[in-house]
Amino acid sequence: MKKLLVACCLLSGLISAHALADASSDLQARLGKVNSFHANFSQKVTSSEGTAVQEGEGELWVKRPNLFNWHMTSPDESVLISDGETLWFYNPFVEQATATWLKNATGNTPFMLITRNNPDDWKQYNVKQKGDDFELTPKSASGNLKQFAITVTPTGTIKSFTAVEQDGQRSAYTLKGQQNSSADASKFKFTLPKGVTLDDQRQ
């Protein structure tokens, strides 16, 4: 009887591991079907108690694996651009820009996961799937991300994604009007505006 129970437990574990692997592979395959796209997005941030913290909107351009432009237009403008080597963050309100090497960018943030679609990044998560909905839980609790969920169709269209931080704060993004076309190369280049302070961390 004990041998039967042990065998059942082992089989259950193998099936569970296989399901997680299949979910991760399916998610990567779906995202991999679209290498370049543009979409509008809306953002809603809520506290752990469910209180609204911020609502915003913007535009997103992606050309995988390493080019993207995340342009937040409201409530405050900010821009995050990758030119393939450098990651630029620009805040017009404070007239400051930060430059870091893209290769040093962490893979445990939702945006980097979506844009890079790097197999090494996905290995850091347990992935569960229910239809077009994927739920990701970090294997390590050392980071700030507690849970990440994304809805993506079989053809690679991202409908929404949500990130929950360790303190319970939830950031939900809804994407609309995704167009799978190649963006102009200028979208992935950043020129430091006159009078803007640069914090260059590429040392």
UniProtKB/Swiss-Prot annotation:
Residues 1-21 form the signal peptide. GO terms for biological process: lipoprotein localization to outer membrane; lipoprotein transport. Its main location: periplasm. GO terms for cellular component: outer membrane-bounded periplasmic space. The keyword Nucleotidyltransferase does not apply. Gene3D superfamilies: Lipoprotein localisation LolA/LolB/LppX. It comes from the Bacteria. Keywords: Chaperone, Periplasm, Protein transport, Signal, Transport. SUPFAM superfamilies: Prokaryotic lipoproteins and lipoprotein localization factors (SSF89392). It is found in: Periplasm. InterPro entries: LolA/LolB/LppX, OM_lipoprot_carrier_LolA-like, OM_lipoprot_carrier_LolA_Pbac. Pfam families: LolA. Participates in the translocation of lipoproteins from the inner membrane to the outer membrane. Only forms a complex with a lipoprotein if the residue after the N-terminal Cys is not an aspartate (The Asp acts as a targeting signal to indicate that the lipoprotein should stay in the inner membrane). Belongs to the LolA family. PANTHER family: OUTER-MEMBRANE LIPOPROTEIN CARRIER PROTEIN. NCBIfam families: lolA (TIGR00547). This is Outer-membrane lipoprotein carrier protein. It comes from Yersinia enterocolitica serotype O:8 / biotype 1B (strain NCTC 13174 / 8081).
